[in-house]
Design a protein with these regions (language model features):
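Short, solvent-exposed loop/turn elements at beta->coil junctions and helix N-caps
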Residues: 6-9, 82-87
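Short, well-ordered alpha-helical segments
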Residues: 21, 26, 34-81
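A short, glycine/Asx- and small/polar-enriched loop/turn
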Residues: 88-94
Length: 104
């Protein structure tokens, strides 16, 4: 599956647009990690547990978007973007989305 944040894929011709491909995940924080994050925040620096959690969440959302695109019959997704939103205290959603297309 080819992915691009641009409207096109260099060297490929879009032959058909198949619609919106999307994938999401919702992750909740862990109370033990929150305590460590508070301490890290006070001391300054990167909160690596949250960085890792967000990176894993982006990959999972992207994998689910690719799966959705395959179900639509696509071999590529263009205009790939990510969105995040707070669902409730301590839980966030990451959404990956783009236009599922056929390219040759």
């Amino acid at each position: 599956m080819l992915l691009s944040t641009a409207d096109t894929i260099v060297g490929k011709k879009i032959t058909k647009q198949l619609g919106l491909a999307k994938g999401n995940t919702i992750r909740a924080r862990h109370i033990g990690r929150d305590i460590m994050a508070i301490l890290r925040h006070i001391a300054g620096g990167e909160i690596t547990d949250y960085t890792k959690m967000m990176a894993e969440s982006r990959e999972q959302a992207l994998d689910r978007m690719v799966e959705d695109a395959r179900k639509l019959g696509a071999n590529a997704v263009v205009r790939v973007s990510f969105s995040t939103s707070m669902i409730m205290g301590g839980a966030s959603e990451i959404l990956a989305y783009g236009t599922a297309v056929m390219v040759e």
